[in-house]
């Protein structure tokens, strides 16, 4: 078995995702691995009148700029490993798996919010979907309180 040299870390900028990134950074340091830090912007798929398209595009462009800056900030605070920021739009469940294939990820690291019961059934679990469909092992990190 070869140890992973390419890690994909999915972030939604939550505390749980930041803990997953810290775990991945520690792991990457020990394995001399590279990290691809991915954020997925969910874009609603609904019919929008032509007038609203410009507003929606402006909002998406603004969100992309903000999320790029946040990814760069997360990476710059962890200079001990090579982190490449990746920003995509779409359904996170699909995009995470697609990007894992694109970058040749050998391990996906992501946080889990630990939703239970009805909320989990209604919302679904991104982590659970990724575990089922990923082309490589997936390490999920539960948020812990200090």
Where are these regions (language model features)?
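Active-site phosphate/pyrophosphate- and oxyanion-stabilizing loops and adjacent acidic/basic residues
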Residues: 25, 72, 128
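Gly/Ser-rich helix-loop-strand patches that form or flank binding pockets
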Residues: 99-146
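General small-molecule cofactor/ligand-binding pocket signal
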Residues: 36-38, 84-88, 139
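Short beta->alpha linker loops
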Residues: 66, 87-91, 113
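Generic structural signal for helix capping and beta-alpha/helix-loop junctions
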Residues: 44-45, 95, 117
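A short acidic, glycine-rich active-site loop
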Residues: 55-69
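Small/aliphatic-rich secondary-structure junction motif
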Residues: 2-54, 146
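Structural beta-alpha unit
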Residues: 1-3, 23, 30, 75-108, ...
């Amino acid at each position: 078995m070869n140890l992973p040299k390419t890690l994909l870390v999915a972030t939604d900028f939550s505390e749980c995702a930041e803990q997953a990134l810290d775990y991945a950074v520690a792991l990457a340091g020990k394995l001399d691995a590279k990290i691809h830090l991915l954020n997925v912007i969910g874009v609603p798929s609904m019919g929008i009148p032509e007038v609203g398209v410009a507003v929606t595009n402006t909002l998406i462009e603004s969100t992309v700029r903000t999320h790029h800056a946040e990814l760069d900030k997360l990476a710059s605070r962890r200079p001990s490993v090579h982190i490449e920021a990746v920003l995509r739009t779409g359904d996170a469940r699909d995009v995470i798996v697609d990007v894992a294939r694109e970058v040749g990820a050998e391990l996906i690291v992501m946080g889990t919010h630990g939703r239970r019961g009805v909320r989990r059934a209604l919302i679904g679990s991104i982590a659970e979907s990724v575990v089922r469909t990923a082309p490589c092992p997936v390490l999920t990190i539960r948020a812990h309180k200090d």
